[in-house]
Structure formats: C-alpha cells, structure tokens
C-alpha cells in the first residue's frame, strides 16, 4: 500500500505540472498579465467577484489566470481565499439612489427623472465577429457626454410608490442573516435568499428566469430599472460614532416590475423582484431579480407552478462551487462501492440464470 500511495503522489505532482504547462500555453508567446485580465476581461472579473463573494478585481483576475480561464474554478479559488480573511467591520447599507451612474435604463417609462443613459452595452450590436480585433489596432476614443450625469436619481419603484401602485419596502431595522456564518434553513428569510442568489451560478439562474417566462411560474415582468455605477461605501467606527466614506464600489442593480396582485386587505399593486451584483454583470442581476420574484410566490398566496418557485430546489442547487465539488467527487476512487454493486449484480444474474434453468426443466 505504501508503494501505491507514493506512486499516486508522484502521478498527482506530475499532473499538476502538466496542468501548469497547459495553463501557460506556448512559451514563445508573451504571458498574459493579471492587469490585462483585469482591464480587458472585465466582465469575467465581475462574475468571479460576484459569485466568489469578494470585491477585489486584482484577486479575481489572478484567480482567472490561475484557473486558465475556467470561471467556475476561479470562483472556487476566490471563495476559498475568502474563508481566510478576518471580518474587520460591517459597512452601512448602500445608498444606490446616490449611485454615480454609468448606465441607467427603464423599459416601463420612456421619460423619467434623471433620464435614460445607455452607457456601455452590447445590446444593439449585430453579434458579428469583429475581425478587426485580430489586427490589434487602437481602440477609438469613447464619446464624452455634453452634460454631467445627475448625482442622484430616484428609483422607478419610488415613483410607483408615490402613485400608490407599488408597496414601499422599508428596512425594519432587523439584522440580516449571514449565510457565511449560519447555514440557511428552508424556508429562509429574504435576506438569506438574496445572498444565495448573488452567489448563485449565472447560467442556472438565467435558465430559471427564462423558465418563468415560458409558463413555469406566474411571472409577468418588466425591467423597471437597471442601473450601473459607483456607490460610496461607508462605515461607522466605534470610536467616532459617525460615518466615514472609505471608498466606492461598482455595482449593477436591477428592479423588475412584476405582475400586480389583488389582495383582500389592500389595494391592487405591482410586485417587484430585486437583483444586485458586483461590476457590470447585468444579465446576472436581471436573472436574479426574476428568480427573487418567483421565490416570493408563497408570500402572495400563489401556488408553485414551476421549479423557479421552489425555494429549496433553487437555493440548494444554485451554488456552482458546491455543485462542481459534488459532481467532481465522482472522479475519486469508488473501488469498494463499485465492487459491492458488481458482486450484487453477479449474484442477481446467477439467481436469474438458475430460475431460467428451473423453468426450462
């Protein structure tokens, strides 16, 4: 057994060296730098930060480089590193209405206070390969706005609330759950639910959000507002007693205006779904908002008509790190388990043959 263990250890070390060589690629080409990944693969960095749970573009870019472009592996690396970090303080709630806007659109109001800002987007491209990029030419300078963007813009739901068309969601002052310290138990609070959706796999949530549009869940959404920009981060040191601005982070926020409900105890009103992610991960924010609203079905007395409305099904399977780990463990040796099933199968086949022979006699 000792020889087998040592042999396996050497094989694993060799496999790691091969993987490192594969990650590096052709040595005659310049190695891609972490700064290049951070600057030129920004959307990949945003996803890794969001699902990895750390706002650090350099670390996310490093994880992408180390993982050879495998974003799920990069998320795993960042999530593992996160567990080594101390918690120094808790910030104040983010005031996204004061976001320094880069992009802001609404599909429900053409004209809204603060205006619509397209910002950077792939929405109106023709999805044709740009072969000019092969020439690695200079990127044309981006146009500059004639006027500065407003420093603060009210949310669309705030406008709907003033017309009593939507309920205002007020902070009740209770401390939100923390899924990194207390494992969620289903059914869970909305704060725990939103935390799991933020860390959830984009593709999984996107598929569930799409399913709600195809009839697997009562959901008729409008993109009430999608905004991307920089939000100030504040904290209150105990020795000072007042808030200090310690920096800003880039966020994308999505609020979906969903089909109205007609409860017995209050006037009919629109419902909402909410998504908030690091960076410019707009598709993830939209998918998160769709699934958030679907998971509110029990609160509105709606039956479960699709998987997106099943809280435990969605939240227990959305984490790609956990899912990848469980699926990957199937690659580990299962010799004893397989031998047990093999022996059982042989015995059943023997019994079957004996019954066949007895029947023939």
PLM features per residue range, with description:
Residues 7-11, 33, 70, 201, ...:
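Intrinsic-disorder/low-complexity, polar/charged segments
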Residues 87, 92-149:
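Helix-turn-helix/homeodomain-like alpha-helical modules used for DNA recognition
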């Amino acid at each position: 057994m000792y020889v087998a263990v040592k042999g396996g250890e050497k094989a694993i070390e060799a496999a790691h060296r091969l993987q490192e060589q594969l990650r590096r690629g052709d040595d005659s080409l310049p190695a891609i730098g972490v700064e290049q990944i951070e600057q030129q693969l920004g959307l990949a960095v945003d996803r890794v930060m969001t699902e990895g749970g750390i706002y650090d573009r350099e670390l996310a870019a490093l994880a992408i480089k180390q993982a050879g472009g495998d974003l799920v592996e990069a998320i795993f690396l960042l999530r593992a590193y996160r567990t080594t970090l101390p918690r120094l303080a808790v910030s104040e709630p983010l005031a996204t209405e004061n976001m320094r806007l880069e992009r802001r659109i609404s599909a429900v109001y053409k004209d809204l206070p603060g205006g619509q800002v397209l910002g950077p987007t792939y929405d109106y491209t023709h999805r044709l390969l740009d072969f000019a990029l092969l020439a690695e030419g200079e990127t044309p300078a981006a146009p500059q706005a004639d006027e500065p963007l407003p420093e603060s813009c009210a949310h669309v739901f705030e406008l709907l609330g003033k017309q009593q068309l939507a309920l205002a969601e007020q902070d009740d002052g209770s401390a939100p759950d923390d899924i990194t310290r207390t494992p969620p138990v289903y059914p869970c609070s909305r704060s725990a639910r939103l935390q799991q959706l933020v860390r959830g796999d984009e593709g999984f949530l996107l598929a569930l959000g799409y399913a709600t549009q195809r009839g697997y869940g009562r959901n008729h959404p409008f993109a009430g507002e999608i905004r991307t920009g920089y939000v100030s981060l504040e904290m209150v040191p105990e020795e000072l007693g007042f808030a200090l601005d310690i920096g800003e982070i880039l966020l994308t926020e999505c609020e979906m205006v969903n089909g109205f409900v007609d409860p017995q105890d209050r006037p009919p009103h629109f419902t909402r779904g909410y998504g908030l992610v690091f960076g410019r991960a707009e598709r993830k924010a939209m998918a998160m908002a769709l699934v958030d609203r679907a998971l509110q079905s029990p609160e509105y007395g709606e039956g479960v008509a699709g998987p997106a409305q099943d809280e435990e099904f969605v939240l227990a399977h959305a984490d790609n790190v956990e899912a990848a780990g469980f699926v990957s463990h199937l690659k580990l040796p299962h010799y004893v388990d397989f031998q047990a099933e093999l022996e059982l199968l042989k015995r059943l086949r023997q019994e079957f043959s004996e019954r066949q022979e007895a029947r023939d006699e």
